[in-house]
Each structure stands twice: as C-alpha cells, then as structure tokens.
Amino acid sequence: MANIKAKKYYSYAKINLFLHILNKRTDGYHNLQTWFTFLDLKDQLIFSFNNSREINISSNISIAAKQDNLVYKAIKKFQQSYRVQDIGVDIEIKKNIPMGAGLGGGSSNAATTLIALRDYYLPQLSNEEMIPLAAKLGADVPIFVYGKSAWAEGIGEILYHKDFSPQYALLIKPDIHISTKEFFVSEDLIKSSVLISKDLGFDKSIMHNDFENVFYAKYPEFSQYLKELDSDFRMTGTGSCFYLLSADKNKLEQLARKINKPLDKWLVKTLNYVY
C-alpha cells in the first residue's frame, strides 16, 4: 500500500460575538445574523492518503460512529459533489476543542477535512467555491471553510469579511450538554425581529445571543454564578460555553483564579484569520 507523507492541519474554534435567530425556513434551518471570530484553541488533524479505498478515522477521545461523524460525512459529500471516487485516507484527530460547547469543534473538523481533500484532489478549487458544499453539512461549517472573521446571514453561509479587534477571551464551560434542537423549540427563545446592519461596530447594547434566555431559564443556579463573576460573560452558539472578552490579559487571569466551581476554563486569544 503506497502512502504519501502524512500532512498536518489545524482546526480552530470559533465564538459568536452575537447570535440573532430570525425565522424558520421551509428546509428546517433558521435564518440568522451573527458575527464569527476565531480562537487560538485548535484541534490537530493528520491526513494520510493512500490507495486502500478505505476511510479510517481515529481520535484521542471517543467519537461518533463513522456514519454519524461529520468528518466522514464531509468526505462522502466531497465525493458526491466533485465525483472523486476511491478515496483512501487515514485521519487522526487530536481533540482539544471541547465538544457540545458552541465552539464549533465538529464543524471545524468537517471544514478542515474538505480543505485537505481539496488540497490533495482538486487544488484548483478555492475555499469560497466550497462554501455551498460546506453549508450542506451544517450551518457552522461555511465559516471554517471561509477562514476569516465574518458577519454571517442566511443559515450562516452568506458571509461578509468583518475583522474584530483582537482580544483575550476567558472561556468557561460547565459540565452541561446542550440539545440544540431543544433550545430551538423552547418557549423561552425570543427570536430577533429586526435585522441589524453589518456595517455596525461591536455594540453589546443591541447585539446579544438569543439562546442565552433559554439557558438562563433552564440553568438558573449556574446563570446566577456567572453573573456574579462578571455580567459581561456571553454564550457562544447554543452553549454551554461562555466567554468574557478583554484586552487586559491580567484581568482575565485574576478572574479565572476566583472561579471556585468545577468548571473547565481556557484563556485564549481571538484570531481574524486561520488560513
């Protein structure tokens, strides 16, 4: 079996600086507005292409069965869309991005897989040309293929490059698994009714995460603890990870030391570009 040299890729996390849910579409997705930026928290994926015609995925943590795995689904979508047959590849995933956190780890891995496949099989394709394919895998996958901080509309596939002033971010995550489907149908979800202009700067008075009310209603004790730590903590995606932004790294380090509950926490930096 002839193997090429293994190639390493990094797969970055994202946060939603705000997330407004507008309405449900006929295809089951929701129209939204959000502003994505990236974090220097990343997974590592190693791709070894070969002539085995087999797809093997391994990881340092327990992952979904192949047919339910977004990386596997990305490979199959790539095959179908670009008529690339007989793909043989071994993929080793080293996870650092927590799962079920709203940081987009699974979507990021899927996007990285599309990029690795493109690099090997169809190097003439641009990242932008793969965005419609990425959208078929999930609403968060396009931003990771795009690779730049962006304002997003539609289901997340209409992207406008929009830098965010670099900051430090303190991430905290309780041991809570969020059901995205449950949050979307919750009576506590108050959808945004007014479109806001993508030309606005970051304005927390009108930019919020519509899912925070759902989380606060479901987990009032943690929500109260969070507000006592700092009222500017925000949720990314549908949670359960919250973040606090600051240009002052020392401030965030001091706050992290005050946390006296068993929460996962990270101190990271925001990134405008990941490619």
Curated annotation (Swiss-Prot):
InterPro entries: GHMP_kinase_C_dom, GHMP_kinase_C_sf, GHMP_kinase_N_dom, IspE, Ribosomal_Su5_D2-typ_SF, Ribsml_uS5_D2-typ_fold_subgr. Keywords: ATP-binding, Isoprene biosynthesis, Kinase, Nucleotide-binding, Transferase. Pfam families: GHMP_kinases_C, GHMP_kinases_N. Its EC number is 2.7.1.148. It catalyses: 4-CDP-2-C-methyl-D-erythritol + ATP = 4-CDP-2-C-methyl-D-erythritol 2-phosphate + ADP + H(+). One of its GO terms (molecular function) is ATP binding. Pathway: Isoprenoid biosynthesis; isopentenyl diphosphate biosynthesis via DXP pathway; isopentenyl diphosphate from 1-deoxy-D-xylulose 5-phosphate: step 3/6. ATP binds at residues 98-108. The active site is at 14, 140. Catalyzes the phosphorylation of the position 2 hydroxy group of 4-diphosphocytidyl-2C-methyl-D-erythritol. HAMAP family: IspE. Belongs to the GHMP kinase family. IspE subfamily. This is 4-diphosphocytidyl-2-C-methyl-D-erythritol kinase. It comes from Francisella tularensis subsp. novicida (strain U112). The gene is ispE.
